[in-house]
UniProtKB/Swiss-Prot annotation:
A zinc finger (C2H2-type) spans 103-125, 141-163, 169-191, 197-217, 223-245, 251-273, 279-301, 307-329, 335-357, 363-385, 391-413, 419-441, 447-469, 475-497, 503-525, 531-553, 559-581, 587-609, 615-637. Keywords: DNA-binding, Metal-binding, Nucleus, Repeat, Transcription, Transcription regulation, Zinc, Zinc-finger. It is found in: Nucleus. SMART domains: KRAB, ZnF_C2H2. Gene3D superfamilies: 6.10.140.140, Classic Zinc Finger (3.30.160.60). One of its GO terms (cellular component) is nucleus. Residues 4-76 form the KRAB domain. Its main location: nucleus. GO terms for molecular function: DNA-binding transcription factor activity, RNA polymerase II-specific; RNA polymerase II transcription regulatory region sequence-specific DNA binding; zinc ion binding. Signal peptide: none annotated. This is Zinc finger protein 14. GO terms for biological process: regulation of transcription by RNA polymerase II.
Length: 642
């Protein structure tokens, strides 16, 4: 005859059935289950349950009462009167089915599913009989390091790991190790994306039971702060809040000494030292130190913009961007700098500004040593070294290093300009552009250079100006090694290698690398030459051309070569001259590889491959590769000696 187990004789209720029982019926159920369990124990039935934790025995609980109590609690909710509607749907399997073995032998390292199995195995090391081993386990142990006393040897051995630093449970995915099995098991869920605790009311899922408990829809907030009256659902949140009044920061980083009021902030901070990035994107492989950063990054792939403005319908990836945008409609600037009184529409902008007064720049680039006031500024700067461009335009698939650059580019497709100047009515694609424009009305220049006293309307112009003093050129071309002060100059230079000409003339179809070149070209079609020389009456298409021309009258040559003393009217001719000293030949023929000092020279040379001869003599029809050869030929018709 097969042995009888507790499951064979136990009566099980569903949660719905349990909710229908009154208190007397539930009490009767507990009494019957206790009696059943007692009878099985008297018959010699051994109860081996992996969920009976050692700490229950340490507290002196009667095993029979504990088993029935736990069985009943699984139906009626928590000890605090939790209703069945607040109980989670637990979707995680027990160790028996997953093959997990959380109980480890401290002698040989062998793992076991059940603690009772570990107990039996331990006797093979100690040589003790069952009753003797039970007595051995119950002998009190005292930790020499902190003086803490333990009722059981295995509890003492676990505690010892906190002093020795032994972490036997290591994550196979990221290598992180843990002292105890339970935290290790919870950590594994962050990789698997497993969220076993589901709220029945709203369907939201959680990795940890504590998070689920905090989420409960009861509306009860039993923990109230006596100082400010704020109430909290859970005791831990209440304790953390109290520290905002006391200023207590009990969690201190051993590496840098920075202290935190919350253990989660402390653990997050530690990753800045260890470089740990446990959250990895499955689409692009990029890893993140923080779960919040990982979730925000996923939106760049999905295109999700969960924060929508009710005023204008504009949607945002991030809540911070949304909050900053909402203030634009109200015009409010509630955050004021204590030093200079300047007001800002976001607390973040105010904090960044305050650092301009104290000069604090705690974030340093490991490659070039440049320091930044904010970690996000450092991360954005690092992309200038790596060339990373994570933001892609869905319409033309062009990629960008910065989300702001992508948004700016997207307006070229939509033409959207939602930010309007209240004084002159001019509209802009971005709030930052509007702010810069507004300063043209009030002449405000809040950014002043400490070295030369020059002031600027915009912080970006100010930072670029500072480089003229430091000589810093952070943007380097990977193809030719040329470096630039401005990112815009660097991007324009890249087109000399790629041949990209995104600006097209609508009248003749000619394309240009730069928007300024297109604007100048368009004047050729209109014939309009608005800039006239006052001395000789000669007219020009561009203001830059007339300035250069005027120097032929004044004799001014502001650009002088330091090596040979020769002076030039224009900066372009001066730079070309410098190449005669340096030997630099930045322009290379794509077909034969021959290098040239000047872009005009490489264009003329390329015609020797294509056969193009754009300069044709009207008198004899002979064509030429270059304008200089054509002008020499024309003299033969005029009778000039060449």
């Amino acid at each position: 005859m097969d042995s009888v187990s507790f499951e064979d004789v136990a009566v099980n209720f569903t949660l719905e059935e349990w909710a229908l029982l009154d208190s007397s019926q539930k009490k009767l159920y507990e009494d019957v289950m206790q009696e059943t369990f007692k009878n099985l124990v008297c018959l010699g039935k051994k109860w081996e349950d992996q969920d009976i934790e050692d700490d229950h025995r340490n507290q002196g609980k009667n095993r029979r009462c504990h088993m029935v109590e736990r069985l009943c609690e699984s139906r009626r909710g928590s000890k605090c009167g939790e209703t069945t509607s607040q109980m989670p749907n637990v979707n995680i399997n027990k160790e028996t089915f997953t093959g997990a073995k959380p109980h480890e032998c401290s002698f040989c390292g062998r793992d076991f599913i059940h603690h009772s199995s570990l107990n039996r195995h331990m006797r093979s090391h100690t040589g003790q009989k069952p009753n003797e081993y039970q007595e051995y386990e119950k002998q009190p142990c005292k930790c020499k390091a902190v003086g803490k006393t333990f009722s059981y040897h295995h509890c003492f051995r676990k505690h010892e790991r906190t002093h020795t630093g032994v972490k036997p449970y290591e994550c196979k995915q990221c290598g992180k190790a843990f002292i105890y099995y339970q935290p290790f098991q919870r950590h594994e869920r962050t990789h698997a994306g497993q969220k076993p605790y589901e709220c029945k009311q709203c369907g939201k899922t959680f990795i940890y039971y504590q998070s689920f408990q905090k989420h409960a829809h009861t509306g009860k907030k039993p923990y109230e702060c006596k100082q400010c009256g704020k109430a909290f659902i859970c005791y831990q949140s209440f304790q953390r809040h109290k520290r905002t009044h006391t200023g207590e920061k009990p969690y201190e980083c051993k590496q840098c000494g920075k202290a935190f009021s919350c253990p989660t902030y402390f653990r997050t901070h530690e990753r800045t030292h260890t470089g740990e990035k446990p959250y990895k994107c499955k689409e692009c492989g990029k890893a993140f130190s923080f779960l919040s950063s990982f979730r925000r990054h996923k939106r760049t792939h999905s295109g999700e913009k969960p924060y929508e403005c009710k005023e204008c319908g504009k949607a945002f990836f991030y809540s911070a961007s949304f909050r900053a945008h909402v203030i634009i409609h109200t015009g409010a600037r509630p955050y004021k700098c204590k030093e200079c009184g300047k007001a800002f529409n976001s607390s973040n902008s105010c904090r960044v500004h305050e650092r301009t007064h104290i000069g604090e720049k705690p974030y340093e680039c490991k490659r070039c040593g440049k320091s930044f006031s904010w970690s996000i500024s450092l991360r954005l700067h690092e992309r200038t070294h790596t060339g990373e461009k994570p933001y892609e335009c869905k319409q033309c698939h062009k990629t960008f290093s910065f989300s702001s650059s992508l948004r700016e580019h997207e307006t070229t497709h939509t033409g959207e300009k939602p930010y309007e100047c209240k004084q002159c009515g001019k509209t802009f694609s971005f709030s930052s552009s509007l702010q810069r424009h507004e300063r043209t009305h009030n002449a405000e220049k809040p950014y002043e250079c400490k070295q030369c006293g020059k002031a600027f309307r915009c912080s970006s112009y100010f930072r670029i100006h500072e480089r003229s003093h430091t000589g810093e050129k952070p943007y380097e071309c990977k193809q030719c090694g040329k470096v630039f002060i401005r990112s815009s100059s660097f991007r324009l230079h890249e087109r000399t290698h790629t041949g990209e000409k995104p600006y097209e003339c609508k009248l003749c179809g000619k394309t240009f690398s730069f928007s300024s070149s297109l604007r100048e070209h368009e004047k050729i079609h209109t014939g309009n030459k608005p800039f006239e020389c006052k001395q000789c009456g000669k007219a020009f298409l561009r203001s830059s051309q007339i300035r250069l021309h005027e120097r032929t009258h004044t004799g001014e040559k502001p650009y002088q070569c330091k090596q040979c003393g020769k002076a030039f009217i224009s900066s372009s001719k001066f730079r070309m001259h410098e190449r005669t000293h340096t030997g630099e030949k930045p322009y290379r023929c794509k077909q034969c590889g021959k290098a040239f000092r000047f872009s005009s020279s490489v264009r003329i040379h390329e015609r020797s491959h294509t056969g193009e001869k754009p300069y044709e003599c009207k008198q004899c029809g002979k064509a030429f590769i270059s304008s200089s050869h054509f002008r020499l030929h024309e003299r033969t018709h005029m009778g000039e000696k060449v």
